[in-house]
Amino acid sequence: MTHQNLLVELFVEELPPKALKKLGEVFATQLCAQLRQLGLASGDSVSTPFASPRRLAAHITQVAAKAADTAVQQKLMPVSVGLDADGLATPALLKKLQALGADVSDPVFAVAALRKAPDGPSTGLRTGKAEALFYDSLVTGATLDVGLQQALLAALAQLPIPKMMSYQLETDCELPGWSSVHFVRPAHGLLALHGSAVVPVKVLGLTSGKQTQGHRFEAYKSPVQVDHADAYAATLLRDGAVIASFPDRRFAIVQQLAQAAERLGPGFEVLMDEALLDEVTALVERPNVLTCQFEEQFLAVPQECLILTMKANQKYFPLLDTQGKLTNQFLVVSNISPSDASAVIGGNERVVRPRLSDAKFFYDQDRKKTLESRVAGLDKVVYHNKLGTQGERMARVCAIARTLALQLGGEALAKRAELAARLAKTDLLTDMVGEFPELQGIMGGYYARHDGLDADLAEAIEDHYKPRFSGDALPRNPVGVVVALADKLETLVGMFGIGNLPTGDKDPFALRRHALGVIRMLVEKDLALDLNALVAAAVPAFGDKISDASSALCDFVYDRLAGSLREQGYSALEVDAVLALRPQRLGEVPRRLAAVRVFTALAEAPALAAANKRIGNILKKADTTAAVDAHVSELLLQEDAEKALYAAMQDIAPRAQAQLDAGDYAAALQTLAALRAPVDAFFDGVMVNAEALDLRLNRLGLLKTLHLAMNQVADLSRLAA
């Protein structure tokens, strides 16, 4: 059985750049997976994707020319059903064999080819299983030309194509005509090589060969002939001026960008952007980085505006100086490498100039009006048909911000937070944010400084959307933290109140991100705010527009917190134990988790966790018959073990409580670990459910007192195996 490496390439018109990387990866992995299912590729086969603007390809190692034949054993029916009293085939058996493709022209011969075996495994108690008839056959393995045809069609069907194109292709049959083909872009060539041999397959109206096309403008040969599957990438580069590998092409771009910046001098740094790098890599087949520049007058515009327009609209890479300030030079990744690049450079400089002029015009126009003068305009902008206008939203954020600020910093902080919240959304009405919504908040900060507001207020307006994404910085000052918290709470409470909850992977209002933002601020800033009170304080700001979904929202926040903590490396048991208590101060959660980790390392931990779980079960069962109070009468303590436990509690519990009050959770749990011996002795020597009611309730009260003392940091029963 011949094993060779396989290469399949689909040559197409320019593919969508933002989808190219994913298309290439899925094409290769799916093709390899389909070949594995057919037995043509093995578990050791490795797939390598190739993707350029005009091609999708996959190189797969160790592909067989023919899959191995497979022995198939199929149970037909019980012998009593398949054979009559004379041992001849019944009509039911013949029909079954015929359906399987067996030759039933001679029923006696057909029966002789069957195998009798017990129907199921025998056991020591019962060995006399009823016999069944089994049909053994050999399934011929698929040949590569048949298997690849099937695998290729299946792989193309699995591609993540958001929108198909329909195009006409001339048929190659005897009768002239046209047929409709559906694919992401029109396909013009198919290459399929097993080693050096062409595998005859046909998809999308194309028949496979060993020729493809190179660079649209700079190929050294046309067509490009690939003589071996392993020579694909090298041949395309040598004869077609194409770097077929997406990662190799991306690496070449990064290298050229760094070299171009280095040539300009030590003070230049390329503003790299992973998404932009991927998109540009998908736009060129052989990159050539060129240095361009624009007029210095545009540097008077906030650099975020210029950077965004260069990256989003033109796919350029801005250059920064050593202070992180934008320079008037930028880098372009071209798809051609002319001997004289001046025309390409001039064209790019000419194209970017109107974009920068627009940005400067927007900036100049926006500064003619103050943010305060725009506040009234928020009443004309609809935020949500059930939650009113941006003006109403602003009023709610102001009210929530005032409530939070009074708790964190008193009246002085409340006044500044209210002012920042009042102006925070006004940049939505500016021309710049209208053109570039990504700049909301950022432009508000610039315009606030222009209006004469102090740095803290300007930063608060700029930062109130933070954190915008995972790993983003938090607001820089207390005013910003208050307004950012208020803004996110307003969104969460409002959306939950009207029933707009995230479902599956759909979260149009980014409620998960807002919840994580609230969590990060409460935890990392260690704010003295209770979660339930925080949510409850935001509800009245909505009046009768919403229903109170505080409980569901708090559950949602704890759920996001649990996921975040697990991502940080805490175990599910640790997280579950701490969050089972629903701690209100989220800033305490890391300290509680650290304490639990210290506790679980103690020798006493497993026994105490198991005892805690046992106590919880006893109390839960007891509470169904009568309420149990955490009260102990020393006069009713009769057994030595319960007296010893009570005495230990009297000694240890106050010390642990003092440590808890001081916030030293780890020390408190270590102190409580000393209860292991008296707890074990109690369960060994005391009957909790005594017949005398007063004794029983007293012992339950002792256990409840113990349970409350042990579970103030975390629910230790969740740590039990």
Predicted features by range, described:
Residues M1-A721:
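Amphipathic alpha-helical "coupling" segments that flank catalytic cores
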